[in-house]
Amino acid sequence: MEKCEGIVIRQTSYRESDKIVRMYTREFGKIGVVARGAKKTKSRLAAVTQLFTNGYFTFFGGNGLGTLQQGEVIENFSSIQQDIFMTAYATYVCELLDKATEERQPNPYLYELTFQILRDIDEGYDPQILTQIYEMKMLPVLGLYPTMDKCAICGETTGHFDFSTRSNGIICHRCFDKDRYRMHLPENVVKLLRLFFIFQLDRLGNIDVKQETKEWLQKAIDTYYDEYSGLYLKSRKFLRDMDKWENMLKKDSDD
């Protein structure tokens, strides 16, 4: 029997009343367990196996699917559960984590980062910015290391910078002619991308960003992911469509 602290990142129906629950845990990394009877409303496993739930878990199992014996809810992130926009961002965070990681490869930092992101979304901080931070932090997990602290071509640390997927990072004005397809970004967007990639989440504080800046950030991050990650996430497509509708509604209300 093994014990762990984890976050439920995916759940699927299994048989009539059971669930297969995918968790990311502090001790073991990503694991899967069968939660017998968890679909029944009166089951002692019903609450602790809900998506996004952070809890303590006890299970039997080896390298394959384990069997969940009991669980205790630490945090259920109730605000996320009750808000469709928060839910969409949190779902994307969890799917990205699921697709980017292998079974039983512990990474306590990644566990803590995911918990902090979900907690901050739940507490009402900007979910789009938090998700963009998470996307940048997940790049090394995917084996991707864009050069963000200096020019990816000449190594200079000063000057004006654009973002180049071709050169795998930012490039300075001295090297602009070497990538005609580079992404020209406002200076503050380049700085934020660098901050998101390099600085710890707790050092970033509460970042207040204009909608236009967030759109630039998303364009750069999406372009990089599309070029290098090899991932297609349904939750990301839904999230981008939802963002478009939300922005249209905001513009209509402002007119």
Curated annotation (Swiss-Prot):
Gene Ontology biological process terms, A to Z: DNA recombination; double-strand break repair
Annotated SUPFAM superfamilies: ArfGap/RecO-like zinc finger, Nucleic acid-binding proteins
Recorded GO CC terms: bacterial nucleoid
Gene3D superfamilies the record matches: Nucleic acid-binding proteins (2.40.50.140), Recombination protein O, C-terminal domain (1.20.1440.120)
A Pfam family: RecO_N
Keyword field: DNA damage, DNA recombination, DNA repair
InterPro entries according to UniProt: ARFGAP/RecO, DNA_rep/recomb_RecO_N, NA-bd_OB-fold, RecO, RecO_C
Family: Belongs to the RecO family.
Role according to the record: Involved in DNA repair and RecF pathway recombination.
Name of the protein: DNA repair protein RecO
Source organism: Listeria innocua serovar 6a (strain ATCC BAA-680 / CLIP 11262)
Upper classification of the organism: Bacteria, Bacillati, Bacillota, Bacilli, Bacillales
